[in-house]
Swiss-Prot record:
The species this protein was found in: Helicobacter pylori (strain HPAG1)
Protein name (record): Peptidyl-tRNA hydrolase
Keyword Electron transport among record annotations: no
Organismal lineage: Bacteria, Pseudomonadati, Campylobacterota, Epsilonproteobacteria, Campylobacterales
Catalytic activity: an N-acyl-L-alpha-aminoacyl-tRNA + H2O = an N-acyl-L-amino acid + a tRNA + H(+)
EC number: 3.1.1.29
GO biological process: protein quality control for misfolded or incompletely synthesized proteins; rescue of stalled ribosome
Family statement drawn from the similarity comment of this UniProt entry: Belongs to the PTH family.
Keywords: Cytoplasm, Hydrolase, RNA-binding, tRNA-binding
InterPro entries tied to this protein: Pept_tRNA_hydro, Pept_tRNA_hydro_CS, Pept_tRNA_hydro_sf
GN (gene name): pth
């Protein structure tokens, strides 16, 4: 079993902000699979089980994401953990993968590292840097960024579909890494 976590903040206030990239990508995946999330009070998270994957959206707010991840890990005992998250150190249009390592100052990852460890896979979605970190990550994408954001989120969703079928992180990494921003046609 694999735990697949999309990071974000609950409530409409934060819907579709840069920091909610993980939520948005998982929502798109679940919708395409014709499934739905169910709220679990036990884990304070929205859950969806598909094949041998548990898809999770913590409802704790970003800085406490580790609480939901730990609770779910302890209950389901997954062999693998993959976190989908925004990364302001990467330009919009870039998708990278990582196995373990530091949290890069991402508070959701800090919480997971503190409570669970940092031994997990990551799907990092670039959101670019802006002036004022908090204001930037909690802002929505600009209208001129929407086409690129949509293409990148679709690319990330396809990477997750590949991973669900293959169970092969390295193959997903080799096939779906975007070191340079994705080119889209106007």
């Amino acid at each position: 079993m694999t735990l697949l976590v999309g990071l974000g903040n609950p409530t409409l206030r934060y819907a579709h902000t840069r920091h909610n990239a993980g939520f948005d990508i998982l929502d798109s995946l679940v919708s395409e699979l014709d499934l739905s999330f169910t709220f679990s009070p036990k884990h304070n998270a929205c859950l969806c089980v598909y094949k041998d994957f548990i898809l999770l959206k913590p409802q704790t707010y970003m800085n406490l994401s580790g609480e939901s991840v730990l609770s779910t890990k302890n209950f389901y005992k997954p062999k693998e953990l993959l976190i989908v998250h925004d990364d302001l150190d990467l330009p919009l249009g870039v998708v990278r993968f990582k196995n373990g390592g530091g949290n890069g100052g991402h508070n959701g990852l800090k919480s997971i590292d503190l409570l669970c460890s940092n031994s997990y896979y990551r799907l990092r979605v670039g959101i670019s840097k802006g002036i004022g970190v908090i204001e930037h990550v909690l802002s929505k994408f600009h209208k001129n960024e929407e086409p690129l954001k949509n293409a990148v989120f679709e690319h990330a969703k396809n990477a997750l579909k590949f991973f669900i079928e293959s169970h092969d992180f390295n193959a997903m990494q080799n096939r779906f890494t975007l070191k340079k921003p994705l080119k889209i046609e106007s």
